[in-house]
Swiss-Prot record:
Residues found modified as 3-methylthioaspartic acid: 89
PANTHER family from the UniProt entry: 30S RIBOSOMAL PROTEIN S12 FAMILY MEMBER
Subunit: Part of the 30S ribosomal subunit. Contacts proteins S8 and S17. May interact with IF1 in the 30S initiation complex.
Entry protein name: Small ribosomal subunit protein uS12
Cross-referenced SUPFAM superfamilies: Nucleic acid-binding proteins
Length: 124
């Protein structure tokens, strides 16, 4: 335990909290332009072709973003909205594209969990 005199001379160091999503710069979402749209394979033990895109953000960062849902309409030069949220089995992918915003369309024929995939309520 430090004495009061020691604490007066050199106070306790504050713990620095490191962000999981530095490119967002404390914003909820950021806009960016797709520079490359491609598929990649996950870590073991999973197997798939995960849809991802490389995005140049408005603040100059270039990040890799996951495209959730079945099927998408993104290509190079598409303008997308990025939110935080990593993909556990894709190393280096720390962002998600927001479906149903800007150039990224919602998922077709989605009935449940629609809000996560940018789908309006169906006419019943």
């Amino acid at each position: 335990m430090a004495t009061i005199n020691q604490l007066v001379r050199k106070p306790r160091a504050k713990q620095v909290v490191k962000s999981n999503v530095p490119a967002l710069e404390a914003c909820p979402q950021k806009r960016g332009v797709c520079t490359r749209v491609y598929t990649t394979t996950p870590k073991k033990p999973n197997s798939a072709l995960r849809k991802v895109c490389r995005v140049r953000l408005t603040n100059g960062f270039e990040v890799t973003s996951y495209i959730g849902g079945e099927g998408h309409n993104l290509q190079e030069h598409s303008v997308v909205l990025i939110r935080g949220g990593r993909v556990k089995d894709l190393p280096g992918v720390r962002y998600h594209t927001v479906r149903g915003a800007l150039d990224c369309a919602g998922v077709n024929d989605r009935k449940q969990g629609r809000s996560k995939y940018g789908v309006k309520r169906p006419k019943s």
